[in-house]
């Protein structure tokens, strides 16, 4: 005799696992077509890793911060995110707290949206309290270089331009670990 597991329990379990790990890579979602195979290069294990030289880029800020880039001689968090990503809604306020706390010590945050369209990006940033620079990776050219595997994916870049830490996805309480890493670098 087999025991049947209620469908609602399976759905709840799937939602919990997805929320705790993070959204799939940028290729896992297309704003108009969730089954799209558009790729940002994530998921192949060949993305930017700890110890790598951070790929350079310049991006226009959508919230009035001018040009966004990895500032030489500063500790920078490069955060890949999307408006459709549930864990990103939790991580943005935590990034803002870190930004306020450590900006005077030299912390920069560069938030790179991998959304297919720019509609909603600025509203998302406002709704979730982001005062740090937020930009749109039109055509996913930056994501193609970095190859984030999950949303959000955060890369902590040291003053020397090397990737010191990589965080894929977001889980509650992760900001304590990130803060410890930042303190050691600032």
Regions found by a protein language model. Give the residues of each.
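N-terminal targeting signals for export/organelle localization
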Residues: 1-56, 165, 176-179
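A short beta-strand-turn-helix
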Residues: 48-51, 56-76
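Conserved hydrophobic/aromatic "anchor" residues
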Residues: 57, 80-84, 124, 132, ...
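Thiol/disulfide oxidoreductase modules built on the thioredoxin-like
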Residues: 74, 123-131, 137-185
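Hydrophobic beta-strand anchors of alpha/beta hydrolase catalytic cores
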Residues: 77-78, 109
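Conserved redox-active cysteine motifs that mediate thiol-disulfide chemistry
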Residues: 80-97
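Thiol-based oxidoreductase modules, predominantly thioredoxin-like and allied folds used
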Residues: 106-118, 130-139
């Amino acid at each position: 005799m087999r025991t049947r597991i209620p469908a609602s329990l399976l759905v709840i379990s799937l939602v919990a696992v997805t929320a705790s790990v993070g959204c799939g890579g940028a290729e896992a979602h297309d704003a108009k077509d969730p089954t799209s195979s558009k790729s940002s290069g994530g998921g192949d294990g060949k993305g930017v890793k700890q110890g790598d030289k951070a790929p350079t880029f310049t991006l226009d800020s959508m919230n009035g911060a001018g040009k966004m880039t990895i500032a030489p001689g500063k500790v920078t968090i490069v955060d890949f995110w999307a408006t459709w990503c549930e864990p990103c809604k939790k991580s943005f306020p935590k990034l803002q707290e870190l930004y306020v706390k450590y900006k005077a010590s030299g912390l920069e945050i560069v938030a790179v949206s991998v959304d297919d369209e720019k509609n909603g990006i600025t509203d998302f940033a406002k709704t979730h309290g982001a005062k740090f620079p937020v930009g749109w990776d039109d055509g996913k050219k930056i994501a193609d270089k970095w190859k984030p595997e999950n949303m959000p994916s955060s890369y902590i870049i040291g003053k020397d331009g090397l990737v010191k830490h990589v965080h894929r996805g977001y889980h509650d309480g992760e900001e304590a670990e990130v803060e410890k890493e930042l303190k050691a670098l600032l």
